């Protein structure tokens, strides 16, 4: 296994993809799970489905485990949201949950393109409801993602490297 694997989670609009890009720009190994691991599947079985919706956004659990089992790099960050996280949560040393207040989330979602997740009124309403309930987010260390991106990533890297040491 990589010396330490970390999951960066949070509801849509909290900054998971931005964190992933920033980690990569710093030369750290980061997987954009929503683009590299995701497919439409049953969150309990992992079986592919034609069904569409938030609840069917799952990651390839075998691929997560495969990447996490690599001996290199020293630190590996998996960024994104998955409805089947319980199928692979055990490979992570820690889960970092990005949090923002409702007004920041609403502003970020309003800036999305109509074809991006959260770009329609219905999707924004669902995301704001999920933000209020946190029902699809694993427990973890809360990271205030209303701060500038560099500060958010600094906090994650500091916590990850203190855990790895």
PLM features: residue spans?
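Hydrophobic anchor at the beta1->P-loop junction of P-loop NTPases
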Residues: 8
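Conserved glycine(s) of the Walker
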Residues: 15
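Conserved Walker
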Residues: 18
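Conserved substrate/cofactor phosphate-moiety recognition/catalytic segment
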Residues: 21-65
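Loop/turn-to-beta-strand initiation segments
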Residues: 72-77
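Short, polar loop motifs at secondary-structure junctions
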Residues: 80-84
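Small-molecule kinase domains that catalyze NTP-dependent phosphoryl transfer to phosphate-bearing small molecules
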Residues: 85, 114-165
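Conserved phosphate-donor/acceptor-positioning beta-strand/loop module used by diverse small-molecule
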Residues: 91-111
């Amino acid at each position: 296994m990589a010396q330490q694997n970390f999951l960066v989670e949070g509801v849509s609009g909290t900054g998971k993809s931005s964190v992933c890009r920033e980690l990569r720009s710093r030369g750290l190994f980061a997987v954009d799970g929503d683009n590299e691991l995701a497919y439409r599947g049953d969150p309990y079985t992992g079986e592919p489905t034609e069904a569409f919706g938030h609840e069917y956004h799952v990651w390839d659990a075998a691929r997560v485990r495969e990447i996490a089992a690599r001996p290199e790099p020293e630190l590996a960050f998996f960024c994104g949201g998955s409805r089947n996280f319980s199928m692979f949560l055990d490979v992570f040393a820690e889960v970092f949950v990005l949090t923002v207040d409702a007004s920041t989330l609403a502003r970020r979602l309003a800036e999305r393109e109509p074809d991006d997740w959260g770009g329609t009124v219905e999707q924004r309403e669902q995301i704001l409801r999920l933000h209020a309930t946190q029902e699809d987010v694993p427990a973890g260390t809360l990271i205030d993602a209303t701060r500038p991106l560099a500060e958010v990533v600094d906090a994650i890297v500091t916590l990850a490297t203190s855990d790895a040491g």
